[in-house]
Each structure stands twice: as structure tokens, then as C-alpha cells.
């Protein structure tokens, strides 16, 4: 029989823990039955069958598809900033439809439960554990902690679960012990389709023995001297000189761990994102100049990279599996670094020491390639490599990077073929993320990021197989629509709506349009004129030492990665593809994505009309979702005066349970109705359906049924009607609502412009010499207007013109008319 205890491992810095020794958690081995624990509805019982040692243990049985189990310890005093280790034995004999968690419940002095910096719960998730196993769960208590308890809870909708627990021990660790303490890693595995041996053999036959290379080595002076004659070469060399003269900020372990303490991503990532553009610039400058003066800095940075504990962004290593060398896996950042290293190795060739080149290959294999190869061979996907069967940009970006590294670095043709086979499987998942009409719910930025890498992958594979494998042919009808999205989503040639997590200045990257021009010219309405090779393929990031952040200086590159495009576009002639398209052509009068749920209306040939509008339906469970059904962007020329505010600055909470507490993510920060005091709900059932779509030369009319976006029992009807009078340059937005009983109702206009009320219900929005006149009215009661600044981390901050009925209404209409005069 085990003695119930709380282990207190103390130092003078942790005297607060000493106070809690008088209140130890009772009955951690369950030998006293339920003493010290609070049970639930019969799902959690103490019984002999669940004992690991002694006579009794805890058994959780859950066959309830509605709610989970609940078994909680007594509460004891605790202290902020203290690292606690819960050690216990567990046995879950079979896989189930759900999971179970062991939680730390940290509370503040008000009794409120505290969350992690990213807004998530402090929990340790368990799935199948066929044999009894001792596990460690380690957490550091958050700020304002005054107490803790242990909670064992099977997740809602779990069925078929039997889980046994016994012999818990709770320890308060010293700072020295906390440095090396970590939770036991329990990989959650899901099936991944395995390619057949026959298909792998077919792919192997397509591969030459010679490895693919992302461009020629430096000693191909004909190619590099031709690039050196490019006017942009001097700019690149000048940037490289500036990089040499600027002290390099180290990426320390302390900076890496800062995210896990604070949830702030930028502390590490502002420095992290300097590495690639800087070393790319140094490497290309060295190849152009061929004097050796940039080589020492390149070698030093590559050696430092090899010695780093993790190549990931900390936000993608939340359990510190990479950092603690428990499990390596690839993310956006590490796979980008791998591609960068692979490319620099190919270009600089024997300028790099052979020992360094071998070390680089070993690190790429260990950190990136081997974990993926394990999935291909086992058919089991660890949770950390979720992107391999994901449907968003991560899939295309990481698959491109991983496949390119394999094709360039693995001598064995059969193994290269295994990566191609895995790529084919992942590609199918990625393409299901697009709607049938080609719409990308992630928004324009991530369309360019994901689809751009997919097109780069297609060119890479085509080159690496000597033209034998073209991954674009199998899905050509859908891919043509996805390619067309880049044009159809544009309001003007210089403006796209920043729906989802997009920057306000979002626009299709030129590199992506050039790749589309190669393979899908019919998806473009006009020519994409190539700049000089170095001009459009090299990174344009600079570091602002005063602001302590990396500044993006132009849309020249694929956000996190630039070398993939350089290897494809930088050594050829894109003019031959451009010649097949007209020099210029107007955008169509309208674009409609029926399954994506977006309408774009433009002036067409009416030179007197400068208005355009993008109106969004869709649903509230999209990739990079915002609760924004009914949101719209209304522009005068290239200036959006009614604006979707785009993405919030990313933090540890951006993709957690706290996401929709941010105004830019929830409906408060969008130009949509505020109904009965409630915001829009989240989820697939929250949907905006276009019930009317009428398009003509003179007028477009669309109606969205928005009722399903709000969880309000009294709501009978809510529609938004947009009328685009192309001939007279007038846009009208009309919101119609009906309740079963009187309720509060209003709507809003969000803008970055100056907002001025000229008369009751008449407003002027003005920015950058463009002006929008707005008349807001209703015959169903007086309206109240209120301009407030939205709470957000972005700058400048958008403002919200609230438009609300003074009194509750049963049936009402609000009409907003927009003109330029």
C-alpha cells in the first residue's frame, strides 16, 4: 500500500510551497476510497479492478455521447510561477472514439479558473495505453495563482472508454529541477493512407539517378554572371554588406521559452524571421560576386543553425517536444529553413566545408525528413505532423519543402519515390480545402502562400522527374478555378478584400501569378509582366533596429520563403509565358463564388463609377475563420473606405479558445448587425446563404439570409440586401429584421478612414484623398450613432460606427446608401 503524500522539493526561493505542506492532497492512491475526491454521475468509481498497487484504484467508464466524466481532488494553496509535477500510473486498454484528460485547475483569489497564455486549459491528454505506465505531467502555475486542484475528465462525446488511474504524487519543483522537467510525451496517432508498393515502384522508375538541384552552383559562371548583370544585383550586394555590418541577434533558449511563459509570439519571431532573408541575401550575393567575402558569415550562421535545439517557431512547439529532443517534426518555419539550407548547399557547393555539408544533411534528415518517412512507412500519423493530411496552407507549404529536400538530398531513388508517394497522398487532402468554385476560405494571403507553394511543388517535381510526373494534370478543372481565384477576388488591380487572417494591404503575390501564367494562363485576364529575375524573386525584408522588428518592404516573395520561387523563376525566362496574354484588360463587372459565398461587384467600363464592393456570406467555421457573415469591403478607386479590418496580430491566444474574444475575430469588429445584444455565433451552422443573385450590365442585386449566424430564439428573419447601381454609381445595403418579440437591433460600419457626421444620419468617410458619402435611415424608429475605436494590437486602429435603434423593435429595416458625391 502506498502512503498518501505530497512531495515538497523546496529551495529558499520557493518558501510559499512550504505553507501548503500543512494541506497535502489526501488519498492520492485511492486506498481510502473516495476520501478527498469529489465524484460525478457514476462514470468515475474507486474499485479493486483499477488498482495498480494496493487494493484500490480509480476507474473511469464513459459511454455517454453527450457529456464527459468528472473527478476532482480537494483544493490546496498554490503560488504563481511555481512548477508542479503530477506523477501517476495509467492504463487505457483500447482505442476509443474520444480522449480523457488530467488537468491542473489553477485559480486566482476570486475563484476564477486561470488559463494558459494561449487561452487553453492546463490539461494532459491521454489516449490508448495498453499496459500500465507511469506518466509525468508538468506545468508552471500562471500569474495570480492562489490554489490548485487535480481534475480527471473524459471529453464530451467520448464513448467506449475505460481508463484506470492510481498512485498519484504531486511535487513542487525547485528552479533547477524545473529546467529539466517535462511532461511525458504520449503520441496521439491517427491512420495515414499508405501508398502501394506498385505505385512507389512506378514513381521510382520516373526518377533519374541524378539528384534534383534548385538552381546551378556558383561555378556555373555563365548563369551567375548573367544574373550579376541584372540591375538588382547591386541592390542585393549592398543589402548583404549591410547585413555584415549589423550585429546579429542570437536566438537563445531563453527567448524560445519566452513564448511559453507569456504567450507573446513576436519576441522570438521578430528575430527568427530575419534569419532566412539575411542568409539568402548573403548566399546569392556570394554567388553573384564570387569573391568569398560573404562566406564566413554564411558558414557561421549555418553552424549556429545546426547547434540550435529547435528549428521550429515556439508557438508550434507548445509541448517543447523539439526543444527537449523528445520528438522532431517539421512545421512551416523548420521546413523553410531546411529548404533554405538545401538551396544554399547546392549553390555554394564546395565553397562550404565538407564537414559542414555533411552535418547539414544529418540535421535535415533528423529534424525533418525521417519523421515524415516514418509516417509514410508506418501508416501512422503523429498529431504533431497533422498538416500531412490537413486541408489548409500548412499542407502545401510543408509538403513542398519536405519533398524538395528529399529530391535534392536523398541519393536512394527508392526512398525519394517514397516521398513522392507520400506527397501524392498529402496533395489530395490539401485540395479538399478549396471550395468547388475555387474559393479559398483562408483569404488571399494564405491562398498565395499555400497555392503558391503547391505550384512550386509542381514545377519541382516536373523538373526532378524529367517531365514524367505532372501533379497538376490530375486535378486540372479544380486547379484552374483555384488559380482563377487570384484574379476574381480582386476589387481593383491594386486591392483585394482582407477576409479571414489577412493584412490590409493583401494582394496576390506576383510570383504566384507568374507561376499561374506558366500553367494556367486562361485563369488570368491580362499579362503578368516579369521583372528582372533578381528583382522579383529575392526577399525584400529589412530589420528596423529602432522598432525591433522585421519590416516587409514589398510583395516580392512567398511570405516565409523566397528561395523556392528563386529556384524556379530566377534562372529562366518568363517573358515567353507572358507573351500569350494581352498587355491589359479590365476586370469583369462581377465575380461570384457560389459555394465560397462571396460576391465582388465592380464598375466595369463605366469610367465615371469608382465604386466596388466585396460582400461575404460563407460560414463561421472556415480556415482562419472570423465571425463575419455579411461583412463587406467598399472601395472608392483603390481606397477601401468601409473595410474588413483583417487579421489581429498573432499571439499565443490567436488560435486558442480565446480567439473570438478579440473584436477583429468576432463580429463586433465587422460591418455586420448586432442582434438582441448578441454577436454572431461560431461554427459550421452559422451560415450566410445567398438567396438572390441577380447580375446585369446596369445593376447587381444579392440577398444574404443571415438568420443562422445568430443564436437568438426570438429571431424570425434577418437578411442583408446589397444593390449595386453600376450606371449611377450608388451602392445600397439594406438590413431587414423580424422578431417574435421586441428586441434590440443595430448594425455597424467599420473603417480606417476619418469619419465625420455632416447631418443627422449623413456621414463622410475620407482617406488618402478619396471620399465616400453615406446616408443611413430607417422608418421604424430613431437611430443612435456612436463612433468608437476598436480594441486591437494592430496599428492604425479601425473605428466602428455603431448604428442602433433607440428602442427595441419587432420588425425593422436599416438602409445605408453609399455614393462618391
Regions inferred by a protein language model and the residue ranges of each:
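Active-site lining segments of carbohydrate-active enzymes
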Residues: 321-445, 456, 574-582
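Extracellular carbohydrate recognition
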Residues: 155-171
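Carbohydrate-active enzyme catalytic cores, enriched for enzymes
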Residues: 455-641, 695-697, 705, 806-808
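Extracellular glycan-recognition surfaces and repeat-rich motifs
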Residues: 29-60, 65
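Extracellular carbohydrate recognition and processing domains
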Residues: 112-145
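CBM-like, beta-strand-rich accessory domains located in the C-terminal region of large
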Residues: 19-21, 335, 544, 549-560, ...
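Extracellular carbohydrate-recognition regions
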Residues: 20-41, 169, 177-178
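Extra-cytoplasmic beta-strand recognition segments
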Residues: 26-30, 34, 70-104, 133-141, ...
